[in-house]
Structure formats: C-alpha cells, structure tokens
Amino acid sequence: MNKTQAQGIGFAFFAVVLFSLSLPMTRWALEGFTPLFTATGRAVIAALLAMLLLKIVRERITPPDHRKEFIYTMLGAVFGWPILIALALLRTETAPVAVIASIMPLTTAIFAVLRGHENVSNQFWIASLIGTGILVFFTASRSSFDGNDLIADLLTVGAVLASSFCYVQGAELTRIYPGWKVISWVVIMALPITVPVTIWLWFQVEDRGAINTHATIGMLVLGISSMYLGFIPWYRGLKDAGTARGSQVQQLQVFMTLGWSVLILGESVPPLTLACSIGIVLAVTWAILSRQGRSKSLQVAK
C-alpha cells in the first residue's frame, strides 16, 4: 500500500466517524420528526450549507458538465438510501434493517469491480466476506426480529444497492472534481424536489410542540455531518485508496455507532460487541493490506 492509498484510508476512516453519528442523531431527530421528513429535511440543510460555501469561494452552484453522472449520484445519496431506509423502518424494527445494511461494504466493492473496473485479489474477497459475516452475525444476535416484513427487506436491499452505487459513482466524479464540489452539487441539484417535499411534510406534523432540543440537534447534525461533511473525506478516501478497498473501512461504522451510543445515549457495550469489534478490525486490516491488482477507472466523457 503506497502513501496515496494510506492517505485514502485515513480520509475514509474520518468519514466513517462522521457517518457513525447517523443512528444516534436519527434517534434524537425522530423524537420530533417523522422518518420521511428526517430524510428530506437533512438534504435541504446540506444544500443550504453547500450553497453558502460555494458562494464564499465564488464557485458555480451547479456542475459545469457530467450532469448525468451527478444525477445518478443524487438519486442514490439524497433519495435512494434515506427514503428507502425510512420506508423500511416504518414497517419493521431496526435490527433486521441493520443486518441487511451490513452487506453494504461488500456490495460497494462489487460495484467498484463491475462499474469502476477495479481489480482486487482473492484475499480481499475472503477478508471482505469474513468481515461481512461477522457484521451479520453481530447485528442478528441483537434482536429477535419480531415484526420482520418482506417488503421492508426488499426496501432495505434497494437502499443498500442505491447507496453502494452512489458511492462508486461519486468516487469516480472526484477524479474530475474535488470531493466537496461533488457532494455540494449533488445536494443542490436535489433542491427542486427536496424543498417542496420537506415543506409539505412539515405541514403534516400534528404536534410541533414535540420538536424538542434533541430533535433539533439531531436534524442539524444529520444535515451537516451525515449528508454533507462526511461525504467530502469519504469520496476523497474512495478515490485515493480505491473504492473497493476504501469501502471496507465502513465495516467499522456499526461499532463506532455503538461508541457514540455509549457516550451520547448512555447505552452499555456487552462483551460480544468487543469480540466482534476485534474480528472486524482484523478483517478490515486484511482487506486493506491485501495485494492490489491493477485498476482502470471508469472513463467519464467530457
């Protein structure tokens, strides 16, 4: 692993730290907002921040080219993952959704190979499968899966595929534009949809008095961190480390989330969690350090 790849892993790790706040902050946000409002509202917050930053540095607020690729990224990052996950959570509890979502690093690697034409070794796939298996075992062990629903499962699978695809497409765009511009243009392009939907959902809120401090902080952190700032180092990390390899760092996210849950929500960490954490760290390290084949990035026509 060369210096650029090591730097990419560092960026990806920092991004996952920011992404790991999503679940605790979503729990706070849901104290006062519906799942769908949380999904679209955070995109609006991210877009407002993006427009402010672009104005400060005097950059255009829409991409100069590659509109089709930006639309693909937007569909996954702004709509696919947040909305499909919200719809799934309306039908079932969190644990079954978490089990299916655990395969995201693996599906991202598959998309990177199929669409991004990256080459990885057999050791990488073995390490990735082991890490994914530990994640599925860990999340499955935390619930009895009461209320499981096939439609919810299919919605979650769709969310995972949408998110994995947008990760790969966004990483390819960062070979042309800086990562912060990519995510800025993505959330801004979604405004014609997210703004009216968010306004409509706001007027559907029956008890605005239930919007407490936790809900407000949760929404702001989701919009600023999970929907915007986290994607800047994430896309840079996937570009430098390689999408397949860099995405494996996300296997650590569930355990980082548990860490935040201890600090923010006062939850406890059982011994099984620590054991699975060690297994995941070893699997991720193996995947990252595995021999890398030559890669050919997706050629985007200008």
Segments from the language model and where they lie:
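Helix-helix packing/entry segments at the starts of transmembrane helices
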Residues: 39-41, 82, 97-103, 169-192, ...
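Hydrophobic/small/kink-forming positions within alpha-helical transmembrane segments
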Residues: 17-20, 24, 51, 75-79, ...
